[in-house]
Amino acid sequence: MRIDEVVRGEIVIMRPKGRLTLETEGEFREAVRRLFDIGRTRLVLDLANVPYVDSCGLGAMIQEFISARRRGGGLKLLNVCGHIRHLLAVTKLLTVFETFESEDAAARSFFERGPRGKARSSSPGGAFFS
């Protein structure tokens, strides 16, 4: 798996290419941890070039979502479609991960304010993994 990264201010757009599976989830986790090590905790995972995610890949996404939240950041998903959207729907994780159709919307979401001026949660179901 190849993972390109684009830095947009405080946000890193991660663009993996290939399947996120048992064989590749270690590479994904390593890339995320490397970003955490340099203080980058606001991540957008662009799934446009990820044709397939298995249970191990999904587990890695969940674990890194939790890790990002604990570090004061977040992991948001971009270009989720087909098999991956179905997988997230069946597992009810569409209520946990915020998903976006545009990079700009995903990036802006880290800075939007919710009711009472509080920063919006990284996900509608964010308390589940707090």
Where is each model-derived feature located?
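Conserved catalytic submotifs in the C-terminal HATPase_c
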Residues: R8-E10, A48, D104
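Short, charged low-complexity linear motifs
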Residues: R15, G82-H83, P124
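Short acidic-hydrophobic, aromatic-tinged amphipathic segments that line or gate anion-handling sites
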Residues: E98-S102
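Intrinsically disordered or compositionally simple regulatory linkers and C-terminal tails
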Residues: R108-S130
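Amphipathic alpha-helical interaction surfaces in cytosolic regulatory modules
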Residues: R19-F97
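Residues at or immediately preceding the N-termini of alpha-helices
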Residues: E25, E103-D104
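Short beta-strand/loop segment at the start of cytosolic alpha/beta domains
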Residues: M1-R15, F129
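Acidic phosphotransfer microenvironment of two-component signaling modules
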Residues: G82, D104-A105
